[in-house]
Amino acid sequence: MLCVIAKLDKRSTEKLTAIQRAAAPDADGKPLHGHITLAAYMGEDEAGFMAFCAALLKDVSRFAVNYTHLAVLEETSIVAALAEKTGTLAALHRRIAEVYGSSLNEWTGSDEVWLPHTTLLYEPKADLPAVCRKMAADFAPFTAGIVGIEFSRVTPPGYEI
């Protein structure tokens, strides 16, 4: 699976990491890679998809997103910081989904199901509502900077940026 991700600035990644570590210091041992997934492509023509995205993104510079709250996404066993589905972020996702929606995964294939977020913890066996409440004690809504758009590849057991 080939993903298009919006990369967070260092300050925002550090802020989310601090929230994560305060509530789950042992987490899964991996550093937080601050990003929001715009699209997860599962089709056959990766070169065409990448060329389309590169053309779409060529004039996109830094932009802001607003993180509003934390939530448990039970279907995927994660605690996430949720961002507003507005502005440049939403426009980019919408355009990719319009053209490639049928080749995107179930979570990014349409505007109706896409939920822009940054995963803070993936732990299927944890009491995620309790962890989320603990993280929420250190969370306040904030504006984050998006400093670039990148491709990443999901490969067992992880991903490559």
What is each residue range found by the language model?
Residues 64, 74-80:
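Structural motif corresponding to the early beta-alpha repeats
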